[in-house]
């Protein structure tokens, strides 16, 4: 059975690259808009009223006066270093030897690796990051 949800509010929509064209041509805020989410994937974007009328079986999650944005992309991550965020070192080699290498050696234990990866994913999702590359 398909699970359908409608998430409504003001949508931030990119039509083009804001570094290539004037920002006013690249980005738009659509008021009273909505996203249709089916089985966890966005399948449609339209006005709130149109999507609700077309999908009366969908659960509606209104977010008036809220801006719904695309997820952030982090193109370079070091998830094994999650437990040592903000650790201090005088020089890079000191920092690597004192914090990074010992911490990354702990990932030899699957339970520890699973714990830190879950913490990392929770932190990134809580801050709006939906895509990461290492």
Model features per residue range: what roles?
Residues 1-54, 66-67:
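N-terminal metal-binding scaffold of metallo-dependent hydrolase/deaminase domains
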Residues 13, 20, 30-31, 80, ...:
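Generic, ordered loop/turn and secondary-structure boundary motif
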Residues 20-22, 57-60, 75, 97-99, ...:
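Surface-exposed beta-strand edges and their flanking turn/coil or helix-capping segments
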Residues 27, 40-46, 56-60, 84-90, ...:
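Short, exposed beta-strand "edge-strand" segments with a Pro/Gly-rich flavor and a Y/T-containing core
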Residues 44, 63, 72, 81, ...:
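Structured catalytic/translocation cores of nucleotide/phosphate-coupled proteins
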Residues 86-134:
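Alpha-helical scaffold segments that flank or form the walls of functional sites
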């Amino acid at each position: 059975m398909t699970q359908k949800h409608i998430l409504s509010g003001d949508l931030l929509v990119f039509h083009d690259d804001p570094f290539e064209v004037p920002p006013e041509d690249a980005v738009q805020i659509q008021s009273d808009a909505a996203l249709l989410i089916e089985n966890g994937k966005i399948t449609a974007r339209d006005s709130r009223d149109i999507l609700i009328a077309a999908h009366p079986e969908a659960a509606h999650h209104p977010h008036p006066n809220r801006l719904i944005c695309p997820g952030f992309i982090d193109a370079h991550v070091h998830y094994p270093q999650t437990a040592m965020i903000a650790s201090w070192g005088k020089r890079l080699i000191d920092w690597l030897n004192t914090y990074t290498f010992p911490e990354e050696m702990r990932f030899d234990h699957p339970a520890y690796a699973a714990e830190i990866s879950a913490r990392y994913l929770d932190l990134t999702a809580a801050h709006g990051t939906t895509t990461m590359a290492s």
